Amino acid sequence: MRIHNIRLTSATDKDTSMAFLPLTHVFERAWDMFCLQKGIRIYVNKRPAEIAKIMPEVRPTLMCAVPRYWEKVYAAVNDKINGSPKLLQSIFKWAIKVGRRRNLDYYRNGKLSPLNVGLAYKFIAKPLFNKVKKAAGLDNGNFFPVAGARLADEILEFMHAIGINIVY
């Protein structure tokens, strides 16, 4: 627990977590113990196949997950965007580029982004990403630890670009 307390200092008793992995999974068990020690409210989903329906109801601030969960979120977002009109697809792809520049090139490195990137992110990309995150129940997320297998760089970068803080 000590290592979690050092690395995850922003977790407080005001946070909520969603548990959907089996408790036999060591990652879920360790994460839940950490949450209990911090006083974090844990919602237990007994139907993992329905996680996409339940997430918007719970809207956790923290949640441990295996890469497969994020692969499914990524696929669902891409399916939705690819089924949208061409104009919306173009806007979303442009917004992802802006999000990557702002969140990965600058923000993650502790730098301020150029004015044009910052404004494009604030007024166009971020509101669009907020809608995506809200639909997935990830709009309250502070951070989401991932372990158990390798998460593809493309998915990790996409999630960071839209403002989902995956700790990997």
Task: List each model region and its residues.
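Alpha-helical hydrophobic/aromatic positions enriched in membrane-embedded helices and signal peptides
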Residues: 14-20, 140, 144
